[in-house]
């Protein structure tokens, strides 16, 4: 998987257990996903076809599965596909995490990852009153992103309370 670490803007956070890495998504990918999401929301037929809410835990009115072809699209000629950009971010995360380990982990980190398997992806269009309760995501890595923020959240008094995400860590008890 190709990777240009110099073009990926990332910050590491380690508040507890697993390392969190915050990435800055380039604007062309944001624009591509927003255009895609807006087209789905504008079409009742497409919105129903891609409705993913039965597979998710939240109380959210618009949750749409991202079709596989979107991951392979490029926002322009100069950028890799969304999947390849995300793969480069994942590679950076894995290398950074492994380099915190022992000598054997460092050797593995230098090789990088060879394959990424994407299990599920969806867009959530949150509106006033929507919420997601605490829940688990299964798999090795999870990602979340914000593509649009209402002006009231970006500038007004709501800024300090709205649009938050909370990460919890632990193993599910099976009893």
Predicted regions and their residues:
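Non-heme Fe(II)/2-oxoglutarate
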Residues: 2-110, 129-132
């Amino acid at each position: 998987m190709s990777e240009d670490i110099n073009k990926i803007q990332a910050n590491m956070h380690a508040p507890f257990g697993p390392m969190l890495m915050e990435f800055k998504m380039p604007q062309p990918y944001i624009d591509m996903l927003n255009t895609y999401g807006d087209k789905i929301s504008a079409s009742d037929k497409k919105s129903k076809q891609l409705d993913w809410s039965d597979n998710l835990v939240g109380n959210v009115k618009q949750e749409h599965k991202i079709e596989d072809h979107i991951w392979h699209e490029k926002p322009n000629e100069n950028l890799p596909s969304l999947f390849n950009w995300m793969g480069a971010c994942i590679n950076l995360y894995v290398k950074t995490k492994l380099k915190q380990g022992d000598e054997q982990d460092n050797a593995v980190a230098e090789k990088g990852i060879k394959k990424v398997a994407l299990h599920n992806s969806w867009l959530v269009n949150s509106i006033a009153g929507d919420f997601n309760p605490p829940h688990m995501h299964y798999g090795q890595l999870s990602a979340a992103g914000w593509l649009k923020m209402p002006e009231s959240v970006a500038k007004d008094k709501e800024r300090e309370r709205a649009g938050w995400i909370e990460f919890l860590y632990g193993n599910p008890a099976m009893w």
